[in-house]
């Protein structure tokens, strides 16, 4: 870490330390989504705004100070029936994002749009939504999800040759994300004795709002008839709470080319929380493996795998959160594709100003290597680090 990064991080730490005093007028905030009822139907609109300032350093380049932002809207319409069932529709609209944030679903404005039925016998979802193997994932505690290394929705490093986020070369993720927000049908059981089951069926890897409408483009090695299955468990034992997760996604290669195969993607994870009295300590992690190169379901090979390991810990004391995160991943070489390795570390401190606002400061270091070819910097390796100050507003 160089001097300029140290200065930036020191400034961020001072701002974070001033948070409680400066936020005294905000401490009583408890904003709820805007809502209205009409003819037995209830409609609401919530959302999340992310704003991040950072100082990043990369190989073969000068340090760079910048900012990134994103805005999501969460509309919902539902009706409670006389039998206690609730029916409705939900969505997530990516109202704004730049090239470094909010892009986990591939630039979709309408990231999610689905119908649901919630009953005492379980919940059914029908439409453009996460699959069961991702939605039920437990992969370790985080101070702030969006800026974590694992499943990052905000990054600080740009490939100057493309203008896109450099981390897209191998985006590590420890939950099974193979069916993304493709149109699907899902069912989740009620939780019984701490156990919940989930299953999803995705006919085709397309985003047409509802499944079975379109088969999508007929491209080579496309996966059809994908099935997600997941199980998780939550239990409490005195001062200890335990969460465990297993998920998988399997598909059929409908246009197989030599060397490619059906998709098989699976993960195991968990988290252990212990109540210390004045604070809570959480530990967790996950293992994720897929035959999709760099976890890409459209590039599933017959031999070789990609795997990701994630470990994290978090200490929560009142409104303060302290976290450490470690992630590593390897994508085996395939045909003309190089072997890729990535390792990352992150330390962060968060302060919950109120139920709507959280301020987080931190530092992360990432390293990427390849066994053939070079990255944009002309080297087979890329080292990068960043200090950041992140504000999340959620209603």
Enumerate the predicted regions with their spans:
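Transmembrane beta-strands of outer-membrane beta-barrel pores
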Residues: 51-55, 93-97, 130-132, 201-205, ...
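Outer-membrane beta-barrel "beta-signal"
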Residues: 382-395
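Repeated loop/turn-to-beta-strand initiation elements of outer-membrane beta-barrel proteins
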Residues: 83-87, 121-125, 194-197, 237-244, ...
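Outer membrane beta-barrel
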Residues: 32-51, 62-207, 233-236
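Detector for outer-membrane/organellar transmembrane beta-barrel domains
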Residues: 229-348
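N-terminal periplasmic/intermembrane-space "pro-region" immediately following the signal or transit peptide
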Residues: 3-6, 10-15, 19-46
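Outer-membrane beta-barrel architecture
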Residues: 74-76, 114-116, 186-188, 230-232, ...
């Amino acid at each position: 870490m160089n001097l300029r990064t140290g200065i930036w991080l020191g400034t961020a730490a001072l701002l974070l330390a001033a948070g409680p005093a400066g936020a005294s007028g905000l401490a009583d905030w408890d904003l709820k989504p805007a809502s209205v009822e009409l003819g037995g139907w209830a409609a609401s609109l919530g959302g999340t705004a992310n704003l991040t300032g950072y100082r990043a350093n990369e190989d073969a380049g000068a340090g760079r100070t910048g900012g990134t932002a994103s805005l999501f809207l969460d509309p919902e319409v539902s009706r409670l029936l006389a039998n206690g069932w609730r029916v409705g529709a939900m969505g997530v609209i990516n109202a704004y994002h730049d090239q470094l944030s909010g892009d986990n679903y591939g630039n979709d404005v309408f990231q999610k749009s689905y119908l649901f039925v919630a009953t005492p016998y379980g919940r059914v979802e029908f439409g453009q939504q996460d699959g069961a193997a991702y939605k039920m994932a437990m992969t370790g505690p985080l101070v702030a999800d969006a800026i974590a290394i694992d499943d990052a929705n905000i990054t600080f490093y740009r490939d100057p040759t493309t203008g896109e986020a450099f981390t897209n070369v191998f985006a590590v993720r420890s939950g099974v994300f193979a069916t993304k927000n493709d149109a699907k049908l899902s069912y989740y059981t009620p939780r019984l004795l701490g156990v919940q089951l989930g299953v999803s069926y995705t006919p085709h890897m397309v985003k047409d709002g509802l499944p079975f409408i379109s088969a999508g483009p007929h491209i080579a090695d496309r996966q059809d008839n994908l099935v997600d299955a997941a199980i998780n468990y939550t239990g409490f034992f005195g001062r200890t709470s335990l969460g465990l997760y297993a998920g998988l996604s399997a598909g059929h290669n409908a246009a197989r080319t030599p060397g490619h195969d059906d998709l098989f993607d699976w993960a195991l994870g968990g988290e252990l929380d212990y109540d210390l009295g004045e604070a809570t300590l959480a530990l967790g992690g996950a293992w994720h493996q897929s035959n999709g190169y760099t976890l890409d379901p459209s590039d599933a090979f017959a031999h070789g795998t990609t795997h990701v390991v994630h470990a994290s810990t978090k200490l929560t004391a009142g409104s303060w959160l302290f976290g450490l995160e470690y992630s590593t991943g390897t994508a085996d070489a395939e045909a003309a594709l190089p072997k890729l390795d990535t390792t990352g570390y992150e330390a962060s401190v968060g302060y919950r100003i109120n139920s709507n606002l959280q301020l987080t400061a931190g530092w992360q270091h990432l390293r990427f290597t390849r066994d053939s070819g070079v990255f944009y910097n002309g080297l087979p390796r890329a080292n990068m680090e960043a200090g950041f100050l992140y504000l999340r507003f959620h209603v």
